[in-house]
């Protein structure tokens, strides 16, 4: 091969190699562009890890859950049809109470990011139960927890998390700005009621599916306040009770009927010498029963029951097994307010079964400690103090606090009756303990017609925390 042929051969080989290399580079560029386009499309739809998004489309809930696995966002989607929580069934027959949840929020909060809260309560849809709570805009064991014994501040918000979980920034959902609140589900969406503002002019903001739908202005300009537990829904309408006026004298009380977040009717109770605060309400056979707190002059609990047209009856639980705190020792009851130790009070609940009543109360007669459930077979109408069942929930040596009712509808449980349940707040910190903060955890129980056990399920946190020393 002469020199010219060698040059031509080498040139040809180089040209072939160059063309192959160019084709490989073009293929690589195309591959990168296609891969980038696919990733960009997925990222446009995805949200951060473990975040749930609910989209409402033509009366169908689309429940979307995003799970982050090795930096790849996978979207799973399940359509869930909405229902109407009828509330027409009767309360389930029960013989005792089975423990349902315990969040251990204070114990976990000594080392983890847990909200400073008070007034927790539970409410259930046809799909899930959630714990609602009023935060103080602060975390446990942090400087902003100082002074959180205060009830009403602009930093308080209503938030919620899955039942049984400690309330933290990582699992909680903002609901409303509020220092007094209620929430419930009608089978289609969550209704939240959050009261905030000055004592002499607070406003309740109603939200339905997270959107503001109505407001209620304080009508007596004296600390408008509501239940601190779930509202009650029947046949697509939800009902709540609000108070406006003195905490130690005659106040004004209204029942509100709400549909899809808008007030459609209200009635003011004609209730002289009655005092209603922080009512615990539940549906039973298509009507609503609320058992409340008398902070004026009763150591037994007032009640109001009403139908869907807001036609109501009022009274006091007659039993000599008194349900408020402070209270006298059990004795002879009254179907009106029992005056001894009647001033002040604590949020509580009871469940009516015919002439009988399940009474939840603190074990102590003068401090917020201990908790027990008592069945008085004649206590709704009879004034004696005889009872047939007592179930221990929290020992008298451990702190308790507010308590309230919630229910699980047949659409959730699959049984043909409404299951009665209750929660107990376990308050820790100020004013009884040497801390700079006040907060609480919670436990809950549901009624069953099978074996149960009495025990003590206390908060269990060891105080003080590092921030308190």
From Swiss-Prot:
Residues 28-469 are virion surface. The keyword Translocase does not apply. N-glycosylated. Residues 91-469 are annotated as: Head of neuraminidase. Glycans are attached at residues 50, 58, 63, 68, 88, 146, 235, 386. Keywords: Calcium, Disulfide bond, Glycoprotein, Glycosidase, Host cell membrane, Host membrane, Hydrolase, Membrane, Metal-binding, Signal-anchor, Transmembrane, Transmembrane helix, Virion. The keyword Transmembrane helix applies. The chain crosses the membrane at residues 7-27. Substrate binds at residues 118, 152, 277-278, 293, 368. Its EC number is 3.2.1.18. Residues 36-90 are annotated as: Hypervariable stalk region. Its cofactor is Ca(2+). Residues 11-33 are annotated as: Involved in apical transport and lipid raft association. It is a single-pass type II membrane protein. It is an enzyme of class 3 (hydrolase). Inhibited by the neuraminidase inhibitors zanamivir (Relenza) and oseltamivir (Tamiflu). These drugs interfere with the release of progeny virus from infected cells and are effective against all influenza strains. Resistance to neuraminidase inhibitors is quite rare. Belongs to the glycosyl hydrolase 34 family. Homotetramer. Intact N-terminus is essential for virion morphogenesis. Possesses two apical sorting signals, one in the ectodomain, which is likely to be a glycan, and the other in the transmembrane domain. The transmembrane domain also plays a role in lipid raft association. Catalyzes the removal of terminal sialic acid residues from viral and cellular glycoconjugates. Cleaves off the terminal sialic acids on the glycosylated HA during virus budding to facilitate virus release. Additionally helps virus spread through the circulation by further removing sialic acids from the cell surface. These cleavages prevent self-aggregation and ensure the efficient spread of the progeny virus from cell to cell. Otherwise, infection would be limited to one round of replication. This is Neuraminidase. It comes from Influenza A virus (strain A/Chicken/Hong Kong/FY150/2001 H5N1 genotype D).
């Amino acid at each position: 091969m002469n020199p010219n042929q060698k040059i031509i051969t080498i040139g040809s080989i180089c040209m072939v190699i160059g063309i192959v290399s160019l084709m490989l580079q073009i293929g690589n560029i195309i591959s990168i562009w296609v891969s980038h386009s696919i990733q960009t499309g997925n990222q446009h739809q995805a949200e951060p890890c473990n975040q749930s998004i609910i989209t409402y489309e033509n009366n169908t809930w689309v429940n979307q859950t995003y799970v982050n696995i090795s930096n790849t966002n996978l979207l799973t989607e399940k359509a869930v049809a909405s229902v109407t929580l009828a509330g027409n069934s009767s309360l389930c027959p029960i013989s005792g109470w089975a423990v349902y949840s315990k969040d251990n929020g204070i114990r976990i909060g000594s080392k983890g990011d847990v909200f400073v809260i008070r007034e927790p309560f539970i409410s259930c849809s046809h799909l899930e139960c959630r714990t609602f709570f009023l935060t103080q805009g602060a975390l446990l064991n942090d400087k902003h927890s100082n002074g959180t014994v205060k009830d009403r501040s602009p930093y308080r918000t209503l938030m919620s998390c899955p039942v049984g979980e400690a309330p933290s920034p990582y699992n909680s959902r903002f609901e409303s700005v509020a220092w007094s609140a209620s929430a419930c589900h009608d089978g289609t969406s969550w209704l939240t009621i959050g009261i905030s503002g000055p004592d002499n002019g607070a406003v309740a903001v109603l939200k339905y599916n997270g959107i503001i739908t109505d407001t209620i202005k304080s009508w007596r300009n004296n600390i408008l306040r509501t239940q601190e537990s779930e509202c009650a829904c029947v046949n697509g309408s939800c009902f709540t009770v609000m108070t406006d006026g003195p905490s130690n004298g005659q106040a004004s009380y209204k029942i509100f009927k709400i549909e899809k977040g808008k007030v459609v009717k209200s009635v003011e109770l004609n209730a002289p010498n009655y005092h209603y605060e922080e009512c615990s309400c539940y549906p039973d056979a298509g009507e609503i029963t609320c058992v409340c707190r008398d902070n004026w002059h009763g150591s037994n609990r007032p009640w109001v029951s009403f139908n869907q047209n807001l036609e109501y009856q009022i009274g006091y639980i007659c039993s000599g097994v008194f349900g408020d705190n402070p209270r006298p020792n059990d004795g002879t009851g009254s179907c009106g307010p029992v005056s001894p130790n009647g001033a002040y009070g604590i949020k509580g609940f009871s469940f009516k079964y015919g002439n009988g009543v399940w009474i939840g109360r603190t074990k102590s007669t003068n401090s917020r400690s201990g908790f027990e459930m008592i069945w008085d077979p004649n206590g709704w109408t009879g004034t004696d103090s005889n009872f047939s069942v007592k179930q221990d929930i929290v020992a008298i040596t451990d702190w308790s606090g507010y308590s309230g009712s919630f229910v699980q509808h047949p659409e959730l449980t699959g049984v043909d009756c409404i299951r009665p349940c209750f929660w107990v707040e376990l308050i820790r910190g100020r004013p009884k303990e040497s801390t700079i903060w006040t907060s609480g955890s919670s436990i809950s129980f549901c009624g069953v017609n099978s074996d149960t056990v009495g025990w003590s399920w206390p908060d269990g946190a060891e105080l003080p925390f590092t921030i308190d020393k």
